[in-house]
């Protein structure tokens, strides 16, 4: 996807809240905005 490993980590090494779609650190267990525990990693491959 990205040309550089550093750029790829910066773009995709985050978790997304399933409730409010906020970006969170990869080590997060709860959302920083709403406190929801349902987090997923950002998709590395395009859909479709």
From Swiss-Prot:
Keyword Ribonucleoprotein: yes
Name of this chain's protein: Large ribosomal subunit protein eL40
Gene Ontology CC annotation, any one: ribonucleoprotein complex
Recorded GO MF terms: structural constituent of ribosome
Gene Ontology biological process terms from the UniProt entry: translation
Similarity comment text for this entry: Belongs to the eukaryotic ribosomal protein eL40 family.
Organism from which the protein derives: Methanobrevibacter smithii (strain ATCC 35061 / DSM 861 / OCM 144 / PS)
Domain of life: Archaea
Keywords: Ribonucleoprotein, Ribosomal protein
A Pfam family the protein falls into: Ribosomal_L40e
């Amino acid at each position: 996807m990205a040309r550089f490993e550093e750029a790829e980590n910066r773009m995709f090494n985050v978790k997304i809240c399933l409730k409010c779609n906020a970006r969170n650190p990869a080590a997060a267990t709860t959302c920083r905005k709403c406190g929801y525990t349902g987090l997923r990693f950002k998709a590395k491959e395009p859909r479709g």
